[in-house]
Structure formats: C-alpha cells, structure tokens
C-alpha cells in the first residue's frame, strides 16, 4: 500500500493533483481543503495517501494531514458512503468540525454537504459515533481534567453527551469533581 507520497507538484486540476516522484506522475484525488492548502505548482509536497484497488482501477486519495486520512478511512467504512462522498464531506468541513457534528449528533451540518441526504447523515452519525477522537486530531469538546471527570460521571449515569456538555457549560470554573457532579445533576433536573 502507498501510505505517503513526497514529490514535485506538477498540476492542480480540482479535485485531482499530479505529483511527480522520480519521473513517475501520480494522479491523486484530494479534498478541496487539501487542494487549497497546497503550494503552487513546482513546489515539493508531501501527501498522506489511501490506495483503493478495484477490478478496473487503482485509485489514490491524498490528504494534507494524517488526521484527514484517518477520518476518510472511517467515513468509507460507513455503509452508503463511498470514496467520492467521503471526499465531499472532508471538502465541506474540517476533521474537527466533522467530529463535533458527530459528537453533538448534528445531522443538519452533514446534510449541507452535496451527496449527503437526511438518511445518509443519520446513518453516518450512528455508525461513526465515538470513532473520531484525539487519535484523529479532533478535540471538539476539550475540557479540563476535573470537568472530564464530571462529564464521564454524567455519561455513566446515562445522560447523553449533548446533555452532559450543556450541563458542564453551566458550571463555574475551578469547581471540584463532587461539587461539579452535584451542580450538573441539578442543572439537568431543571
């Protein structure tokens, strides 16, 4: 498998770029976010890649960061999401925005992406729940240590992540874990 390519950028024709590596020109499909981040032609570039081998073609997909590639790999595992749709998702939002949409179960943000309807967005949210995190580089709800303990306690008590995060926002700074849990439960009871 080809995991990374470093070479000279010879052409940018959205959504494809061509990278010359020792006389071999690789055709690589990239999301628009990666395309816009690339330097002008003639510059040296490094792309993290994902190779798809089909009966009729070998397709190479490129990404500016390893976290984009990891998100792409998770997206194509969702039933009904192919490589083209996964590229469209990553063209329409950053990995952090995608992780946040999944965490907060915001199907409306996903339906703004061309090719993603309501049912596909809901399936994507269901199948990707909990799969994009710090290892992907997305921290959509980074919280201090004491607040993460409070969040974990609320989740263990059966509250949804969305409800728990909303309750955390009502807590004053510097609150201890036990007092924080108590106040968060009061906020959730309202």
Swiss-Prot record:
GO terms for cellular component: cytoplasm; Holliday junction helicase complex; Holliday junction resolvase complex. Residues 142-190 are annotated as: Domain III. Transmembrane segments: none annotated. GO terms for biological process: DNA recombination; DNA repair. Signal peptide: none annotated. Disulfide bonds: none annotated. Residues 137-141 are annotated as: Flexible linker. GO terms for molecular function: ATP binding; four-way junction DNA binding; four-way junction helicase activity. SUPFAM superfamilies: DNA helicase RuvA subunit, C-terminal domain, Nucleic acid-binding proteins, RuvA domain 2-like. Its main location: cytoplasm. It is found in: Cytoplasm. Residues 1-64 are annotated as: Domain I. It comes from the Bacteria. The keyword tRNA processing does not apply. Belongs to the RuvA family. Has three domains with a flexible linker between the domains II and III and assumes an 'L' shape. Domain III is highly mobile and contacts RuvB. The RuvA-RuvB-RuvC complex processes Holliday junction (HJ) DNA during genetic recombination and DNA repair, while the RuvA-RuvB complex plays an important role in the rescue of blocked DNA replication forks via replication fork reversal (RFR). RuvA specifically binds to HJ cruciform DNA, conferring on it an open structure. The RuvB hexamer acts as an ATP-dependent pump, pulling dsDNA into and through the RuvAB complex. HJ branch migration allows RuvC to scan DNA until it finds its consensus sequence, where it cleaves and resolves the cruciform DNA. This is Holliday junction branch migration complex subunit RuvA. It comes from Bordetella avium (strain 197N). The lineage of its organism: Bacteria, Pseudomonadati, Pseudomonadota, Betaproteobacteria, Burkholderiales.
């Amino acid at each position: 498998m080809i995991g990374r390519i470093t070479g000279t950028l010879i052409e940018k024709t959205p959504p494809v770029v061509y990278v010359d590596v020792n006389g071999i020109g690789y055709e690589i499909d990239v999301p628009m976010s990666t395309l816009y981040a690339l330097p002008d032609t003639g510059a040296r570039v490094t792309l993290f890649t994902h190779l798809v081998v089909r009966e009729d073609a070998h397709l190479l997909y490129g990404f500016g960061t390893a976290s984009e590639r990891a998100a792409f790999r998770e997206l194509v595992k969702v039933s009904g999401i192919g490589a083209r749709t996964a590229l469209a998702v990553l063209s329409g939002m950053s990995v952090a925005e995608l992780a946040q949409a999944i965490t907060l179960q915001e199907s409306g943000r996903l339906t703004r992406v061309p090719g993603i309807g309501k049912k596909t967005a809901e399936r994507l949210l269901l199948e990707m729940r909990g799969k994009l995190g710090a290892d992907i580089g997305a921290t959509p709800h980074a919280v201090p240590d004491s607040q993460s303990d409070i969040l974990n306690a609320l989740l263990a008590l059966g509250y949804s992540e969305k409800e728990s995060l909303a309750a955390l926002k009502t807590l004053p700074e510097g609150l201890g874990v036990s007092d924080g849990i108590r106040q968060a439960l009061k906020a959730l009871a309202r």
